[in-house]
Design a protein with these regions (language model features):
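ATPase nucleotide-binding head domains, primarily ABC-like/P-loop NTPase cores
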Residues: 16-24, 36, 147-377
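Alpha-helical coupling/stalk and coiled-coil linker elements that connect catalytic or binding modules
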Residues: 1-198, 206-207, 211, 217-234
Length: 377
């Protein structure tokens, strides 16, 4: 294989010694190399995309490194000169262009694709550590650029402060990063919390805001708040559970598995747990009994910080010695419901499900009967 690319040149030289033999050898060597080139290409064709990708990374790294004040990678780009300048030769040419077809024929005759591919591959293998450094260089710059662009889209953000002496989280003006015109909340999560409140009052969004910002704080040192002091930890959630027809799990079974996963977490590192509408998939009596038991169990784990949301006001009373009660509420006026989405101390003292029947134009008979049923239950 080493001599094959030179056969057409050698046979062409023979023409000047013996024209008939030389021409015959030249044609045979050209035909042989064309067939051999096409056959060999199948063995490395799948790797061409990786070669092109690595070459583009090297080109971008080299270009960026030449920018004034740009950080310099630990890469000697001279060692990859062949890869940066000649990888494009390996690209497919346009079969409808006569000039391109001539180039393709020359490449086949002299096996240029095969020679270049293995030359570039050898340089990558020889200088693998520097190639990895270039990938890391581009990845780091891309990460910083993406983070800077993300921060520019935020109306309010800050870098989190780590305080290992703080057993929870303290934040000001925290918002959900994916909600436009989100309502900000101030809070200190120093104890386990039980959230109560009406439907759509903001319980779930508040928990998601905290959970997402803990992850953002750990991942990109950016939170959507004006202040965020926390002890780093791992986030576990049991939210938005759903039944699974394929596996045969009912909603309640899916919820059980989700909460069991949290219960079995070892108590050897900081854990932040968020449980939304705990055990809502079963009847009221057993839901309250099971919820009290699970939340009491989690309370005993010293490294856990738990925020659980429920519609069961009774649960707030049962857990008042272990969990601090907070709530969200609403105001109903003139058949309109208004939420301020602000967290408040204490358990909820309002309910809106029946009033929502009226506001959403259910038949008056249904609304009145539901209202009359409340004292009887």
């Amino acid at each position: 294989l080493f001599l094959c690319p030179f056969l057409p040149v050698i046979s062409f030289a023979v023409i000047f010694i013996n024209s008939q033999v030389g021409i015959l050898l030249f044609l045979m060597s050209c035909l042989f190399n064309i067939i051999l080139s096409a056959t060999l290409k199948r063995t490395y064709e799948d790797d061409l995309k990786s070669i092109f990708y690595a070459s583009n990374v090297l080109k971008q790294g080299y270009t960026i490194s030449k920018i004034k004040h740009a950080p310099q990678p630990e890469v000697n780009f001279k060692q990859f000169r062949t890869a940066r300048h000649l990888t494009s030769v390996l690209a497919e040419v346009n079969d409808e262009d006569i000039g391109a077809m001539v180039i393709k024929l020359v490449k086949l005759i002299f096996m240029l694709d095969y020679v270049l591919f293995h030359s570039i591959q050898k340089s990558y293998t020889t200088h693998m550590n520097e190639l990895k450094n270039c990938f890391d260089y581009i990845a780091e710059l891309d990460n910083h650029y993406a983070l800077a662009m993300y921060r520019r889209t935020l109306e309010c953000y800050t870098e989190p402060q780590i305080d290992d002496s703080n057993d929870g989280i303290v934040f000001s003006e925290l918002t959900h990063p994916l909600i436009a015109d989100a309502v900000a909340n101030d809070f200190s999560l120093s104890q386990n919390i039980l959230l109560t409140g009406s439907n759509a009052s903001g319980k779930s969004t508040f928990m998601k805001s905290i959970a997402i910002n803990i992850i953002l704080a750990s991942a990109i040192q950016t939170v959507t708040a004006s202040k965020f002091v926390y002890q780093p930890g791992i986030v576990f959630t049991s939210m938005a559970n759903a039944d699974d027809v394929l596996s045969g799990d009912s909603y309640f079974m899916a919820e059980l598995k989700s909460i069991k996963r949290i219960v079995e977490i070892p108590d050897n590192q900081k854990i932040y747990c968020f449980i939304d509408e705990i055990f809502k998939g079963t009847n009221t009596t057993e839901r309250i009994a099971a919820s009290e038991s699970v939340l009491s169990f989690l309370h005993e784990k010293s490294n856990f910080r738990v925020i659980a949301a429920t519609h069961d006001i009774e649960l707030a009373e049962l857990l008042k010695q272990r969990y601090e009660n907070y709530h969200f509420n609403e105001v109903i006026e003139n058949n309109n419901i208004h939420f301020d989405y602000k967290i408040k101390p204490g358990k909820a003292n309002t309910r809106n499900a029946i009033e929502l029947l009226k506001i959403t134009s259910f038949p008056a008979k249904i609304y009145e009967r539901a209202k009359d049923n409340v004292p009887k239950i």
